[in-house]
């Protein structure tokens, strides 16, 4: 969970405290990656879930207040340019991590290991959330398959 707000909300849900550690990962992609990495090293879990708040891009597929298990995360904002001039790193031929030994390369998109997906579509992770319909349109033009955006994916 990114923040204490999400943890407090979820703590009131049935069976929330029934499964393993429930750690905070922090706010934003960098903090979430660093904190998640340190917690995985400590707890050595078989599975990790990111549970938090995301903004929906399609309320008919993912209603406000709904929950979803998504099969993919796409990173937006790593590349060149902004808005309609933005070009993702992958389109320029760059990986975020080239991979090493048994480790897979990491690009603009990560396919998640999920038992099943509750809806089709991807989660878009951004350093700054959409502030307007225009922001959302720019992102949907580039990533038409996304149904929601967060800042920790």
Protein language model features and the residues they cover:
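Structural motif
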Residues: 47-49
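Short pre-catalytic strand/loop immediately N-terminal to key active-site residues, enriched for Gly-Thr
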Residues: 19-25, 142-149
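Mid-sequence, gly/pro-rich, charge-dense loop/helix-turn segments that line enzyme active sites
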Residues: 58-144, 148
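Short His-Asn-centered micro-motif
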Residues: 25-26, 51, 70, 127, ...
